[in-house]
Amino acid sequence: MSNIIKQIEQEQMKQDVPAFRPGDSVEVKVWVVEGSKKRLQAFEGVVIAIRNRGLHSAFTVRKISNGEGVERVFQTHSPVIDSITVKRRGAVRQAKLYYLRERTGKSARIKERLNRTNTN
């Protein structure tokens, strides 16, 4: 019974999800239905948390909109998500960046992660 559930979950998982970590700036394009119209809405911000649970994986994105902090939790493999684009890689040392909720302005900035190349 468990193998059947795992197989069905594996089929429903998206394969085109880019690799991103907490601290990265991402743009998530989501399908929004307004009346009879269906359109794409972009949500761009910093990933502050990732929850890895297979098909039930989720991530939280935080942005500042009109001086107010807005957080949105996305299900990674949801059909509502059209695309996820990594805009900037952030250098952080923690898995959950909830401390950004209390910070504003320059103290809420995250350093950019530099890719190390092997010169041997």
Swiss-Prot record:
Gene Ontology process terms (BP): translation
GO terms for cellular component: cytosolic large ribosomal subunit
Pfam families linked to this entry: Ribosomal_L19
Keyword annotations: Ribonucleoprotein, Ribosomal protein
Signal peptide annotation: none
Gene3D superfamilies: 2.30.30.790
GO molecular function per UniProt: structural constituent of ribosome
Keyword Transport on entry: no
Function: This protein is located at the 30S-50S ribosomal subunit interface and may play a role in the structure and function of the aminoacyl-tRNA binding site.
Family: Belongs to the bacterial ribosomal protein bL19 family.
UniProt xrefs under NCBIfam families: rplS_bact
Name the record gives this protein: Large ribosomal subunit protein bL19
Organism, as annotated: Yersinia enterocolitica serotype O:8 / biotype 1B (strain NCTC 13174 / 8081)
Lineage of source species: Bacteria, Pseudomonadati, Pseudomonadota, Gammaproteobacteria, Enterobacterales
Gene responsible for this protein: rplS
